[in-house]
Regions:
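Extracytoplasmic thiol/disulfide redox context detector
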Residues: 1-47, 102, 106-120
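Cysteine-centric redox/oxidoreductase cores and disulfide-bonded domains
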Residues: 42-120
Length: 120
């Protein structure tokens, strides 16, 4: 029911995406009439795809915002070890995350985000 919706397609290995994160977080925290919708668009290889799948899986556990923010503010681009470590740090069930990352619905959602980004 927000007056304005911002849709951000992002990749956890994208420098401009990472650079814009603090500003988007500021908007999310201070603007009541603005809604931010995040769409995964992994374009920088297999680690990007795995990080995107992990973010979707984190959403299934109700911890997307914490996981997303942790990856966006990390000191290095995420690899598999850091993805799982970050998941544990933000309180995710890592074994469930691993299973959900392989779920066909997660893979389908990721494909839908790609198609939506291409249409935008």
């Amino acid at each position: 029911s927000a007056a304005v919706t911002i849709v951000e397609f992002y990749d956890y290995r994208c420098s401009p995406c990472i650079a814009s994160h603090p500003e988007l977080e500021q908007v999310r925290a201070t603007e009541q009439d603005v809604r931010i919708v995040y769409g995964q668009l992994p374009i920088f290889g297999s680690h990007s795809v795995m990080a995107a799948r992990a973010a979707i899986a984190a959403h299934l556990q109700g911890r997307f915002n914490a996981f997303h923010s942790a990856l966006m503010t990390a000191s290095a681009y995420p690899g598999m070890d850091s993805i799982y470590a970050t998941a544990a740090e933000v309180g995710l069930d890592v074994e469930k995350l691993r299973a959900d990352m392989r779920d066909p619905e997660v893979l389908q959602y990721l494909e839908e985000m790609r198609l939506l980004a291409e249409a935008a």
